[in-house]
Amino acid sequence: MKQFIVSVAILAFTFPIFSWNNHAGITYLILKDHWKGKPTPKVKVESLKTFLSKEKSSIQETLSISEEWALKKLPHLTPTIESLKFSKTTKDADLVLSFYKALRVNPNHKAALYIQAVPKRNGTKLPLDQLTTLNEKGKLVNETFLSLQEGQIIGADEVLVSATDEPDYDLDLYLFEDNGSEVGKIYGFGSQPFGNPAIEFSSQAPFHMGFYYEPGIIFAFAGFLKQTYPEYRIHQFTELSKLAFRTGHPYWGYRFAGWALHYIQDLTQPYHSSVLPRVSAAKQIGVQLVSIVGYQSPKNNMINFISGRHTLIEEYQYYLIRNLIETKNWDHPVANSITEFSEQSFVKWQGIDLLRGNVCKEAYDAGDPMDEQLENLDIPKYETLYEPTHPIHTILGTLLNNTSKHTRAYLDALKSN
């Protein structure tokens, strides 16, 4: 009977999936003073194929380091099958595809040479279909992407700003065996543990969320919530970044670092580290059980109640950050929360092994008070930006201060390696 209830609960358990919108805008504000008055490093643009062709003897060794770490850390992760592993004898024409499959990411990701222009500026625009395979482009249609040429010199900040947004473009889409893709059948991730496998953007959710602090009874009924992979991605791209810097490829050093930062920034978002803030374990289980026998309204009401606040904070953050950058309103309290750091405010990057204990625990603990504060605002949905003294900016400023803090710590560690 218990197995039946657990099986049905797994099928019934659903919740809204959101992440920080506008990673590029947030990272732009963080990097405004990152080099503290020193010239921003310049790097030469390099295609992924060029990087792989020059360093192909080291690629699989680097990926194996990450996999060995991840297999010890993530009991649900299965080893990469031999046929997917990157070979130093791979033909040049197959390098990029082989690399993607060895990473176990979307093999159709484009890795175009581009920057996301933050703030907007003129240049040769890159069509969105050369950047992403997403059918629903969402807010990407609002952004400006400029095409680059191999050998062009650009700032490291431009690489990082652009790269922190890139994993959302399709890198983790359709990787599970029930997503209807060919790679989903061979990557070994099994069936999608949560979210709707039939919905495009939802298929990436287990790679961008990490639930480590739910009550034990929740994990007992919904153990699938443990099947997440952001740490795997952070480790992979951090090791690749180190390899790129070590072997004289700073463009890819920064770009891989930006990819890793995307997942770190996602985990600073409380709704990515807590399933349903302020909903007790008893209530979560209760509404799931009554839904099994046909009463869907309690579950639907609970999800709609919380998803409204998810949507509000995401939408508001997106349009506010865009506005702050476009108007250069650096004195706004949210801008100050991101950019103003005293020596006492800085933290050291503790490594991926301690990610759960600092980044994720901090976000989880912030979930309940944040959710209550948002409810008390009584704002049903985003409609307009409010005056700087509005309490929504205190909430958002606190959250983005944490995002900024951990981004800075990661980049400081990167500079010291």
Model-derived segments and spans:
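Active-site beta-strand/loop microenvironment that shapes enzyme catalytic pockets
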Residues: S241-R278
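N-terminal signal peptide c-region/cleavage motif recognized by signal peptidases
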Residues: T14-P16
